[in-house]
């Protein structure tokens, strides 16, 4: 690419005529990431729109999830980037759900860029199907902004730090996941996590089937600890479902409250927002609890006593728990252990939204704990930066070193 390349944006309506382009560099097989556009000088002073890695990431989001809420897509990418692709008729807004979906033209472009992607499947416009896809997209955008590799097509990708959506496998004729309700699998740090969407009215789950599928599909993947994550749009949604008393018609199934009470694996609560993004980044750091405890307590840090794995440190003789992972059952275990040790209150630290939405009410106001907020400075010391991941705003290059420009795509 020439050093004279200049950035350009496309603004207008779909009826606006696009610049004339040539066929050169149009077809490709490549790897890359996704978004806005740049132009390069052409003979006769023609200008062509060049797709960037950010553009291609937007299109891949829609291939994986089929529907992404407009507000979620524009939280991960610039609004102008999304509008550019809409103007080019590569994506369109499904008005009833206020969610973007891919057009036939967008699918053709994506197939040219990534020949080995999951096959395009026409979106189902039933409300329940659309809602399920939107929830998957919320999980995916949260992980994406945490720097997790999300565009995976097989569970083997979890040998590295990545997220895999089982719904991708369910679209290939066979269904190795059966009727399990797992929304995503995540390998981050030393953890292998099964993520379930838990919000009001979500229903019941066959826990034995879930755990069997989780173990069978990830047995060959190295991870020191397996865990489960309950996710939703907010902590309030998760806790609302967990606190609801339900009558069951099928004794083989468990409510998510029953899963919460009986699960032997670590269990984290996570919202699909900026706090959830930070939470995932913290989980990606091996030994994050001790590291954060040392950063926060500084010279006041003292190691926890033997036989108290639910403590992360002692702070002036008081049990200290690092609660940024939102393992509430571990906090409750620390409270009980402290009382058995003759200590009436523990100390815990967490992210601001966690403190305000959950921990103050459950622990500070009930006298169970002193609750501290983790500062940005402490997070920067652990993570380097608290800013969410943003893909590079660079041209998308094919495996042959060419670029993708605007092809004369047919109207969808």
Report the location of each language-model feature.
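Electrostatic, structured charged patches in enzyme active sites and in nucleic-acid/phosphate-binding
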Residues: 137-412
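Nuclease-adjacent, charged terminal/linker segments that flank catalytic cores
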Residues: 2-164, 168-192, 229
């Amino acid at each position: 690419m020439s050093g004279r390349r200049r950035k350009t944006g496309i603004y207008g309506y779909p009826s606006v005529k696009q610049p004339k382009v040539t066929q050169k560099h149009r077809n490709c097989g490549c790897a890359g990431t996704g978004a806005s556009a740049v132009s390069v000088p052409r003979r006769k002073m023609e200008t062509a729109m060049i797709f960037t890695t950010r553009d291609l990431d937007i299109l891949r989001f829609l291939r994986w999830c089929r529907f992404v809420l407009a507000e979620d897509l524009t939280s991960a990418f610039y609004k102008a980037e999304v509008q550019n692709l809409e103007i080019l008729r590569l994506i369109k807004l499904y008005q009833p759900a206020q969610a973007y979906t891919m057009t036939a033209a967008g699918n053709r472009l994506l197939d040219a860029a990534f020949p080995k992607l999951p096959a395009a499947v026409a979106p189902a416009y039933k409300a329940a199907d659309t809602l399920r896809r939107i929830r998957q997209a919320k999980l995916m955008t949260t992980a994406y902004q945490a720097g997790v590799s999300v565009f995976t097509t097989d569970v083997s990708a979890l040998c590295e730090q990545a997220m895999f959506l089982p719904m991708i496998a369910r679209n290939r004729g066979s269904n190795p996941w059966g009727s399990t309700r797992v929304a995503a699998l995540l390998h981050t740090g030393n953890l292998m996590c099964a993520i379930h969407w838990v919000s009001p009215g979500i229903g019941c789950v066959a826990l034995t089937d879930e755990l069997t599928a989780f173990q069978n599909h990830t047995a060959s993947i190295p991870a020191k600890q397996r865990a489960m994550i309950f996710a939703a749009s907010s902590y309030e949604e998760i806790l609302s479902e967990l606190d609801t008393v339900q009558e069951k018609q099928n004794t083989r199934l468990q409510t998510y409250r029953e899963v919460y009470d009986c699960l032997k694996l670590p269990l984290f609560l996570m919202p699909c927002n900026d706090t959830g993004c930070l939470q995932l980044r913290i989980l990606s750091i091996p030994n994050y609890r001790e590291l954060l405890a040392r950063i926060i307590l500084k010279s006041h840090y003292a190691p926890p006593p033997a036989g108290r794995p639910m403590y992360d440190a002692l702070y002036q003789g008081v049990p200290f728990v690092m609660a940024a992972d939102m393992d509430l059952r571990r906090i409750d275990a620390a409270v009980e252990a402290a009382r058995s040790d003759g200590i009436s209150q523990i100390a815990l630290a967490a992210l601001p939204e966690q403190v305000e939405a959950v921990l103050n009410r459950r622990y500070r106001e009930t006298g169970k704990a002193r609750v501290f907020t983790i500062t940005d400075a402490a997070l920067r010391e652990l993570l380097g930066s608290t800013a969410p991941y943003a893909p590079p705003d660079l041209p998308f290059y094919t495996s042959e070193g060419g670029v993708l420009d605007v092809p004369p795509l047919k109207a969808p």
